[in-house]
Amino acid sequence: MEVTNLIEKCTKHSKDFATEVKKLWNDELSSESGLSRKTRNVIRNILRDITKSLTTDKKSKCFRILERSTINGEQIKDVYKTIFNNGVDVESRINTTGKYVLFTVMTYVAAELRLIKSDEIFALLSRFFNMICDIHRKYGCGNMFVGIPAALIILLEIDHINKLFSVFSTRYDAKAYLYTEYFLFLNINHYLLSGSDLFINVAYGAVSFSSPISVPDYIMEALTFKACDHIMKSGDLKYTYAFTKKVKDLFNTKSDSIYQYVRLHEMSYDGVSEDTDDDDEVFAILNLSIDSSVDRYRNRVLLLTPEVASLRKEYSDVEPDYKYLMDEEVPAYDKHLPKPITNTGIEEPHATGGDEDQPIKVVHPPNNDKDDAIKPYNPLEDPNYVPTITRTAIGIADYQLVINKLIEWLDKCEEECGNSGEFKTELEEAKRKLTELNAELSDKLSKIRTLERDSVYKTERIDRLTKEIKEHRDIQNGTDDGSDLLEIDKKTIRELRESLDREREMRSELEKELDTIRNGKVDGSCQRELELSRMWLKQRDDDLRAEIDKRRNVEWELSRLRRDIKECDKYKEDLDKAKTTISNYVSKISTLESEIAKYQQDRDTLSVVRRELEEERRRVRDLESRLDECTRNQEDTQEVDALRSRIRELENKLTDCIESGGGNLTEISRLQSKISDLERQLSECRENATEISRLQSRISDLERQLNDCRRNNETNAETERDATS
């Protein structure tokens, strides 16, 4: 259903959003929780309406329409205030899928309307995503995801995006896998886009987004882009495709589906599909023109999200998927052309009936030309015919992949079963049949290539003959007699018809070969099969060349790394030696510092000793003067001894005189006093001799300390000179 008026669209989409939230209101969050494609499309539609209204005078009105929509009889704005509760205990209040969807969408809408500065948006989203991490950690709902709309992304700087990415990458317990993948894509896309001239740009309203790599559908849904938006690509991107819609689920399950896609031949499209509200609407970009080593989203498992959220796989778990040949190619939608009216001619087979799905037959009305009216329509003769293969179980080129995979599985099974396994015979028979099938497939492919070359040759010949016929007719129109030229024209026409018949026979043979390979009677288009085969072979060849280049680069990088490792080992040895030398120097420096400190103390002590030495020298000088005096006094000692002997003589005489009674008492008294003076002087001289010996020993000690200090000062000076050099 197509809607045009913005207010009408906003009213309808607000009602759809409220209905979807109400339906999911009581679904408790768990590890199995996830949003269906219908729910994701409903979210995208309402966010697109709000984004479009930002450049009009209707933005407040669209927001009011959304706020006044009711859920269980209560307006959305009141419900949002209740579950948000000013950010208090949010993880306990948002415990169901419906509340989760309402909380995220209303937060994004409020941010779009009220914030325009990147710092304000970043601050809000930082708090918001921390709440999201708390919710995911509490309930383990890793598959729940509602990404940031493009209207907010384009206002953020790459530093803000990296910081928001770190919110999820550092919260290992949050289990927010898709949010992490979303910001990882934005980070990779930014740095690849800044260094490349290749790009695909998608835009609507005032928002646009460019990428040089494939863009998965969940990224496009988060950014709110649809296949009806304006698409522009650089001219060097030749193999780019836009997926637009899910056609049906494979094998009656939701594990895998068939999708419609449009090959982007032109550089600009005003949308490749109609603007509808279909639940099965899809939008993803597949870019096969860029190196697969930098495009991690090329794999079909990552590009197109399955309906069952728990079947979603991460990048590290996926295997190569080549099921793109199962999808349907459709022409780009042109709103200026009327919608095509097709009649399938057959009914859609029931889910339980029939072993094979039949292709859609396109019935064309007969031409007014009688020759064309009497024979059935052959699409191979129509130059405007666009072949469409639908519900193909497997493409011709994929048979080789299937055979290789089966042989690999059989080899693995044979290794596990061993030589004495009970299935050895069956395994050998299966491998033999696969080998025969592989040989037959190679033979058929060689025949197909031969027929292709013959077809090109015949086509060129037909063009050449057609040109000659035109020249002959031009000559005939300029002459009166054209009988000879008429015969030539008839002959040429016969040759052309024979060439066309042979071409039809070869095409018929090619169809038979293809039907044999496909093991069934199929009325599909040979040309389409050949086109798919050539495209697949070219893609495989490109992938192989890319892998060879990648391997060569890896080997070169490995050799460079080995050289770097050797150099690093050498540097490591030098570093260890340097560390040892540095540690030795550090220990020496520590020792020197301690010695310097000790020498500084000794220097202080030396100054004290010097002062003491000066004092002692002064005392020594005094003592020397006294010693000289004592020496002079010692000279008097002999006189004293002589005096003593004289005294003894006098005493003897005195004694003799007293005994004899003839002495003079006065003379005796005088002599006794002189003797006393001499004895006093003698005692003083003895005391001076003792003091002199003590001072001499003290002088010897001080001289010894002075010599030690001088030697220490000389050693310190030499050490300081060595450290300085």
Swiss-Prot record:
- Specify where the region named 4 X approximate tandem repeats lies, as residue ranges: 609-718
Coiled coil among the record's keywords? yes
Coiled-coil spans in chain: 418-521, 547-719
Q: Which InterPro entries match?
A: Pox_A_type_inc
Q: Please report the residue spans annotated as repeat (sequence).
A: 609-635, 636-663, 664-687, 699-725
Q: Which GO terms describe its cellular component?
A: virion component
Tell me where it mainly resides. Answer: virion
* Places the protein is found: Virion
Alphabetical GO biological process terms: viral process
Keywords of the record: Coiled coil, Repeat, Virion
Top-rank taxon of the source lineage equals Viruses
One Pfam family it belongs to: Pox_A_type_inc
**Protein's job:** Structural protein that forms a matrix surrounding the mature virion (MV) through interaction with protein A26. Presence of protein A25 in the virion structurally prevents direct virus-cell fusion mechanism.
Family statement: Belongs to the poxviridae A25 protein family.
Summarize the subunit comment: Interacts (via N-terminus) with protein A26.
A further note on this protein reads: Some orthopoxviruses such as cowpox, ectromelia, and raccoonpox viruses, form large cytoplasmic inclusions within which mature virions are embedded by a process called occlusion. In those viruses, A26 bridges mature virion with inclusion bodies through interactions with proteins A25 and A27 on the mature virion membrane. In vaccinia virus, the protein A25 is deleted in its C-terminal region and no inclusion body is observed.
Its protein name is A-type inclusion protein A25
